[in-house]
Amino acid sequence: MSRKKKSRKPGAAGAPEFVVTRNRTESDVEGRLRKRAKKRKGLKTGSRNSEVNEQKKQSSEQNRDPRLGSKKKIPLIVEPVKKMTKQERRLSAEQELEMLENDAQLNVLLDRIEAGENLGTGLQKYVDEKLDRIEKLMDQLGLLEPEEEEDFTASSAKGSRNDDDLLADFDDINFDDYKG
């Protein structure tokens, strides 16, 4: 019968729940593996020559003088910057408008606003800036229809009702309809 070793893990002395038993052969195998790992700590054999070649390549790159600079040619005459034509600016404005209209984040935020959700100040500011930019681009491209001004005369007529009319409306209200 082979010898059984008890583990040194702490536990209840009376009831050993986690007793690890090891055979002699398992311990021998583990010991051999540890010894083999200890023996092979150093570098690979025969790697001396290849390391020297690699170091020579690296040292030649490191010895390069940084003061020599680049061999890239630099133009001595400054060419004037070409201004965008009206047609190119119009195209870029159309592209920007298309990008803003297809902006996924802006569409999600607008959907949230339509649903009655209140956005934070940062998100609301973002939405306002984007909508203002869309309005400017549409105006620039001639796509924006001028807003029709509402007739303020009709609203001012309602607002100019005198106190007697308002009091008469209040007296005519039937409060029995609102009782639950």
From Swiss-Prot:
Keywords: GTPase activation, Ribosome biogenesis. Residues 23-32, 51-68 have a biased composition (Basic and acidic residues). One of its GO terms (molecular function) is GTPase activator activity. GO terms for biological process: ribosome biogenesis. It comes from the Bacteria. Residues 33-43 have a biased composition (Basic residues). Residues 1-87, 142-180 are annotated as: Disordered. Belongs to the YihI family. Interacts with Der. A GTPase-activating protein (GAP) that modifies Der/EngA GTPase function. May play a role in ribosome biogenesis. This is Der GTPase-activating protein YihI.
